[in-house]
Amino acid sequence: KEVVVTKEVVKEIPKEVVVTKEVVKEVPKEIVVTKEVVKEVPVTTTEVVVADLDPGELVIYSGRKESLVGAIIEEFENLTGVDVQVKYGKTFPVATMILEEGDNSPADIYYAQDPGGVGFLAAEGRLVTLPEDITGAVADWAKPADGSWVGISGRARVLVHTATLTDLPSSCEDLTDAKWKGKLGWAPTNSSFQTMITGMRTMWGEDKTRQWLSDMMANDVTVYPKNTPQVAAAAAEEISIGLVNHYYLHRFISESGDSFNARNLFLSDGGPCSLVMVSGAGIVDTGKNRANAEKFLRFMTSKVAQQYFTGQIYEYPVLAGDHGVKTHMLLPSLEDLNKPDLSMEDLSDLTGTQVIFRDLGMLD
């Protein structure tokens, strides 16, 4: 702004005031003129703002549901300004889509519900080796040795059962007992169930696994399309027990309260039905936004994202060392679970499991 004085001339000089005829008092940060009219004349100024560089985009192919991961992906987008596009679907079909698209696939990130999906894509050579600062943040049990992908959150297999049920099984083998005939549920097309059976093949071998599956079918196990309806069916006493991931029950309880008529049983025998697996993600080799893909994985393995998965989705953290991320108070700690000693590589052969399922008519 300029200062214009009528009749008298006031000239402002740094640290000194010169006045003709009249007396001017200097007051910090303002000028007081005696007997004179002062006009403020607006002066046009130009402010130059240097815009940030375009943060770019990121394309995610997700086998995890939007209801589970949409909020945390949106948080990444808000924090970074990256334009994120997500294609949602089932884990194995999404992986197959990337293979079919070949070099033309727009996917930068493949985000799978379980180790089988990312393990499958890694075996096909479609995932790059991740930087050590990304893999180093994740615990050894939650990632493969070759660094092709990392676990994002931990999920335990459980038996969800009607809350009033007291005579509970203690292992997978118990479920083939005649007393459970017509009272069991499973979801053969669900990739988490397929991953559990893949681990069973590693632990028991092909023959015993096939026999267990056949015995379960002979016990009139009810087939469901996914985990959620099994939890609802157990609560409604349509079945007594379902084979699911642990966190689905807590979503029902959060909506219906503690009176919801179902509970989880974490088997303590260390067998296949007590498996703890991970959702996982890797960078697709043909992706065009590598830097943003790495930024996304760093975010998803940060304490902020890990606390989202534990606090909002009731899953387990996968970080290495003393990370300080709290497991939800409704869950047993990861250290208290007697999970089988299986590597992520042991859980990758979903294709072999699907062959067995087709042979037995489980995917019809």
Regions found by a protein language model. Name each.
Residues 1-57, 76-77, 239, 364:
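Intrinsically disordered, low-complexity Ser/Thr/Pro-rich tracts
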Residues 47-120:
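Early extracytoplasmic/lumenal segment of secretory-pathway proteins
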Residues 105-110, 128-158, 173, 183-186:
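A structural signal for short loop-to-beta-strand junctions that line the ligand-binding cleft
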Residues 121-129, 141-147, 252-267:
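Ligand-binding "clamshell"
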Residues 158-165, 201, 276-289, 308:
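A bilobed periplasmic-binding-protein/Venus flytrap-type ligand-binding module shared by bacterial periplasmic
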Residues 174-194, 199-201:
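Short loop->beta-strand "edge-of-pocket" segments that line small-molecule binding or catalytic clefts
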Residues 182-191, 299-323:
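Periplasmic-binding protein-like
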Residues 189, 202-267:
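Ligand-binding pocket segment of bilobal, Venus flytrap-like solute-binding proteins
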